[in-house]
């Protein structure tokens, strides 16, 4: 901060001056040579234009998902609803398809870069996973689907917590 002040550099959040919408900017960026991901969406979402040069971002997005129960697909769906590109119902279906999927490519690069084993990686992530959000077995271990993805306890988008849900003093205490 001191270096920026002494160099008389001021940061400006452009969103204060004009509406920034990454998806609507993609076409213009492509006219300057930008390329989107041609073989499908990036891990953790349904878009193909962000985080193209860094697979490790998918680990950040996954950690957000295991801690808070939503990830980058939810972020993008909210923007798409707000900008009139998607209905709420379409967004729910899209989020359920993409949010929280284990980032296999990103995990592989992470393990190689940090010289970490897969078992240690999962043990550390599981220790920070919010077990109030995800299914656990009788022993308290997280339950995964056949693809290795965590399974959320609640899939009631917009319905709130259903009546059959056992009452707890706090969803954040285990």
Predicted features and spans:
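Nucleotide-activated chemistry modules centered on ATP-dependent adenylation/adenylyltransferase
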Residues: 1-174
């Amino acid at each position: 901060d001191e270096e920026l002040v002494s160099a008389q550099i001021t940061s400006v959040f452009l969103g204060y001056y004009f509406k920034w919408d990454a998806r609507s900017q993609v076409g213009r960026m492509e006219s300057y040579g930008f390329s989107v991901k041609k073989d499908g969406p990036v891990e953790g979402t349904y878009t193909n234009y962000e985080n193209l040069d860094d697979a490790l971002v998918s680990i950040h997005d996954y950690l957000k998902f295991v801690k808070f129960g939503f990830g980058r697909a939810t972020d993008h769906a909210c923007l798409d609803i707000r900008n009139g590109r998607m209905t709420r119902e379409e967004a729910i279906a899209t989020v359920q398809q993409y949010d929280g999927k284990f980032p296999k490519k990103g995990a592989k690069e992470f393990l190689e870069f940090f010289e970490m084993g897969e078992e240690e990686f999962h043990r550390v992530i599981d220790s920070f996973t919010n077990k109030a959000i995800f299914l656990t077995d009788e022993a308290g271990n997280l339950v995964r689907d056949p693809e290795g993805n965590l399974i959320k306890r609640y899939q009631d988008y917009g319905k709130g917590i259903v009546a059959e849900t056992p009452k707890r003093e706090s969803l954040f205490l285990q």
